[in-house]
């Protein structure tokens, strides 16, 4: 995301959308009553027929829809301003926001949390492709902020089939991996697996892709369970420390350990977390995305809590539905805090 302009007087942010993550962030930030200015198209009656006419409109937001990995955010609302000749003011309309589009978001008042989220997203540039490889199977995935996208998950030919099969299988994996690297242009590649096959794949990858950094690590399997395992590792933090999906998994693991050994250093539930925040006791809070994407009083209460946490130098981690810890956190009320010190 690029922040092209921020007009403090109008409380208007002009943004250029560059990725699926950007669309997901806007889905969380946009609220009922906000205004957006964007290009769109609409069917307009012209005599006996109608045509889809491009135009720029001002839309008062009712709600948004985001579907993971579709490259589109749908913004529903009422048209507040549009070219007079079309006579569509007051009509319901949906803006389809895509990667590459520009949009102006106008709020009555941008809160610190939403502004910081925009700035953090604008600063975020790193991308990584993860390939888990074993002699008989492999998995290729790419993390986005809204979750992990599985690009490929396949079996390989048996080692007993013919001579030289290890080298052939390594070339097959490296070739497919190289295609995804060309498509997504990541900053780094992480190759991991239980045996030495990952080194064979790394050699092939380095021959095909000369200018990409390849990290190698061990993992118990080249499966989704292995993917969950690697997301908790320090190597992920080293490569992509700003991706909350990896950080969230590690923080949740820490919270579960504390609940087992020092339960007084963890609290969950909206009121309990709010009380801990007021006492300045919160080190880290994890919350599921649903709590910020609803249009109700609970969302407003949570936003105030998040602002208070940031003012007291606490850490905030949003957990999307696609995160491996989403349901675990949801079962604990959807919001959990790791504390700096014990409270009554």
Curated annotation (Swiss-Prot):
GO biological process: nonfunctional rRNA decay; nuclear-transcribed mRNA catabolic process, no-go decay; nuclear-transcribed mRNA catabolic process, non-stop decay; ribosome disassembly; RNA surveillance
Gene3D superfamilies on file: 3.30.1330.30, eRF1 domain 2 (3.30.420.60), Pelota, domain A (2.30.30.870)
Keyword tRNA-binding assigned: no
One Gene Ontology cellular component annotation held by this UniProt entry: cytoplasm
EC annotation from Swiss-Prot or TrEMBL: 3.1.-.-
GO molecular function, one term: metal ion binding
Localization in the cell: Cytoplasm
Cofactor: a divalent metal cation
InterPro entries named in the record: eFR1_2_sf, eRF1_1_Pelota, eRF1_3, Pelota/DOM34_N, Pelota_arc, Ribosomal_eL30-like_sf, Transl-rel_pelota
Pfam annotation, one family: eRF1_3
Key words of the record: Cytoplasm, Endonuclease, Hydrolase, Metal-binding, Nuclease
UniProt function note: May function in recognizing stalled ribosomes, interact with stem-loop structures in stalled mRNA molecules, and effect endonucleolytic cleavage of the mRNA. May play a role in the release non-functional ribosomes and degradation of damaged mRNAs. Has endoribonuclease activity.
Known partners and oligomeric status: Monomer.
Family: Belongs to the eukaryotic release factor 1 family. Pelota subfamily.
Domain notes: The N-terminal domain has the RNA-binding Sm fold. It harbors the endoribonuclease activity.
Protein name (database record): Protein pelota homolog
Organism: Saccharolobus islandicus (strain L.S.2.15 / Lassen #1)
């Amino acid at each position: 995301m690029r922040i092209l302009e921020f007009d403090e007087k109008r409380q208007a942010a002009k943004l250029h959308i560059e990725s699926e993550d950007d669309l997901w962030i806007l889905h969380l930030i946009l609220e009922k009553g906000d205004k957006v200015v964007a290009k769109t198209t609409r069917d307009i009656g012209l005599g006996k027929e109608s045509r889809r006419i491009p135009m720029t409109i001002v839309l008062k937001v009712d709600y948004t829809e985001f579907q993971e990995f579709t490259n589109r955010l749908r913004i529903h609302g009422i048209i507040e301003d549009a070219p007079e000749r079309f006579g569509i003011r007051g009509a319901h309309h949906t803006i389809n926001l895509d990667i590459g589009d520009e949009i102006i978001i106008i709020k009555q008042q941008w809160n610190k949390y939403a502004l910081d989220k925009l700035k953090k997203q604008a600063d975020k540039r790193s991308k990584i492709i993860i390939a888990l490889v074993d002699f008989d199977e492999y998995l290729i995935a790419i993390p986005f902020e809204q979750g992990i996208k599985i690009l490929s998950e396949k079996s390989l030919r048996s080692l007993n089939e013919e001579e030289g099969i290890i080298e052939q299988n390594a070339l097959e994996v490296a070739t497919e991996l190289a295609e995804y690297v060309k498509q997504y242009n990541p900053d780094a590649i992480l190759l991991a697996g239980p045996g030495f096959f990952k080194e064979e794949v790394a050699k092939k990858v380095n021959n095909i892709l000369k200018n990409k950094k390849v990290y190698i690590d061990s993992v118990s399997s080249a499966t989704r369970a292995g993917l969950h395992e690697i997301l908790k590792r320090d190597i992920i933090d080293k490569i992509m420390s700003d991706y909350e999906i990896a950080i969230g998994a590690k923080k949740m693991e820490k919270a579960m350990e504390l609940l087992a050994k020092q339960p007084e250093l963890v609290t969950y539930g909206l009121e309990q977390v709010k009380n801990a925040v007021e006492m300045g006791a919160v080190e880290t809070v994890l919350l599921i995305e649903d709590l910020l994407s609803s249009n109700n009083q609970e969302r407003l209460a949570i936003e105030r809590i998040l602002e208070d946490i940031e003012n007291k130098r606490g850490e905030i981690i949003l957990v999307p539905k696609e995160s491996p810890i989403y349901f675990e956190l949801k079962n604990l009320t959807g919001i959990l805090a790791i504390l700096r010190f014990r409270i009554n």
